[in-house]
Curated annotation (Swiss-Prot):
Belongs to the UPF0246 family. InterPro entries: YaaA. Pfam families: H2O2_YaaD (PF03883). It comes from the Bacteria. NCBIfam families: PRK02101.1-1, PRK02101.1-3. This is UPF0246 protein PSHAa2558. GO terms for cellular component: cytosol. The lineage of its organism: Bacteria, Pseudomonadati, Pseudomonadota, Gammaproteobacteria, Alteromonadales. One of its GO terms (biological process) is response to hydroperoxide.
Amino acid sequence: MITVISPAKNLDYTTPPATDKFTQPELLEHSEALMQVCRELTPAQIGSLMKISDKLSGLNAARFSEWAQPFTTENAKQAVLAFNGDVYGGLDASTLTANQLDYAQSHLRILSGLYGLLKPLDLMQAYRLEMGTKLENSRGKNLYEFWGSVIANKLNEVLKAEDAQYLVNLASNEYFKAVDKKALNAQIITPHFKDCKNGQYKVISFYAKKARGMMARYLIENKVTQLSQLKEFTVAGYYFSAEASVKELEPVFLRDEQS
């Protein structure tokens, strides 16, 4: 199984990395093309495009102007350790063993508006460019048109290398939309996580994001290859519900109300 997760808006470039191993992103020529567009934007245009504050607009204008190859441990950080959102709290990559990080390096991928597809230990410079951003570019009017089937083709390489038949989608809709499903050579498993609130099971964003990260870790720790093994996920009180799972490849995990 190959797993994909979303990136995070929050970044941590202050905590020293838990490993000195690193690799380079594989789609940097595409990133460079996007950067040429981004560097032309004024802070005001960035704010309007991304719907962010003046302060954040200025920060990201500076990031765009400072972004430069080559990536080193002095000016970049491993992606899985740099992203700092809810998914990454659940994944908790800094506590993975060296062997688990090696396994993650070949079985986990991070979708990215700027980098396309990242390996966990790929060095990454700070940026903000969400996949849903309507950034006009040489290939179209947004990032979905820019990436086209590039991400799916790269995933196919990973799937083939690991002889994997499943792609586990633990990403958000915004990001997974960037994967050209028709070009993908795999069955897609999309787990759903629902928490009980006021007697009803529903998707609660914060909990669901963290659960995606926890499942990504579970798949790494247990080297899961089959759907039946994935359904055995019972971390943090979640459990597979056959009754709630309407589609075979969309397993639903429930968690009862927290006391």
